């Protein structure tokens, strides 16, 4: 009887010892269920120049002549920007880093100027898979008289994105946690609150520090050049099917909640 009981107990030890953490696996962001910050974005394309009041750092009076203009600044992921006006309701943007495209973007409004669509192709710096995004906005502030219709104050409504830009893979082993994406962003960190490098794409100047908030919750703090950029509270549901990420972007002053589904 005792041997049978011992065998019964020992038979469960491998499963317990090697049980997956709630974070383990591949996750995909459900943009329909996510709640994005409603703080407005501000753009101006007027008198042959482009300005972005909501950008960090801010961008002012960039020539909109279709040629690469120097916009290098600490904290900016591209060093040149080319802005080309297509017509009264649309414009094209190309951001580059060291001559290589970071993104190519088209901005266009509805004929009545009430909605804005920004469609982008994004190119990771390490050559990882490029991916598309499309963001739709609703106007909350008028464009100045004579300005391109893409100007004004805009509130984000929804985002659609290629799977590569929405997917991440997580793995926890003891006090070690790793995250990677198809677009080349990855990190490995201990749950000790110390800073570890973020690799890939434009995140070469970023670090991440991670601490546990419980069996199903962690806090990840991203820093750029030593300054806190974003703090994320990440929690996996009790059934293990959903991961909620509350992202507090300290640089932009925006708080968004992302819902990821287990794949």
Q: Can you describe what each PLM-predicted range is?
A:
Residues 1-5:
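Positively charged n-region of N-terminal signal peptides that target proteins for export
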Residues 20-263:
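Hydrophobic small-molecule pocket/channel-lining residues, especially in calycin-type beta-barrels
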Residues 7-16:
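Bacterial N-terminal signal peptides
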